[in-house]
């Protein structure tokens, strides 16, 4: 852990945004594994033009990682916007996800784009997101940040591995956007156990990024 603190303090350059593999046509319930995508809220709050729909940027909340989504994946690519006979979530369903996702609008969008491909009902999909988050321990180090730091993807990966011994570097992808940490994406089996990401998903940010401190 001492080495982790030293690495977080290193002044380095900013990183470019990460590109992603392509989406594919899909059928609900037909996929190979999940990606749990965790967004670093301070980066989003810094870059978003309008944050009124999210409480993650409220001053004094010191929000760190929030859930972006739980995404069905193929071993190559991923499905999205799958046809489904499942009804859409109610407003109450999406409001109940605000504590994890920061906004009901994001919960709705994630259901529409990714949840429909899970083959689950909306309420069960949201329950699955909650279950997935209980499987991952957020490193305490990041919640204690009191200043912006510059670091590389392996430092973040090592912190998650130290807090979650079942994880490996091949099971974590760290992305950046606009020179800031964007997301940590963790690959899970369909029953939410850690696994390696497929090769096309292992695309870490290759340069140094800034990790803005929670406010």
Cite the ranges covered by each PLM segment:
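Positively charged n-region of N-terminal signal peptides that target proteins for export
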Residues: 1-4
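C-terminal region of N-terminal signal peptides and the immediate post-cleavage residues
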Residues: 19-21
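Domain-level detector of nuclease and nuclease-like folds
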Residues: 35-39, 49-215
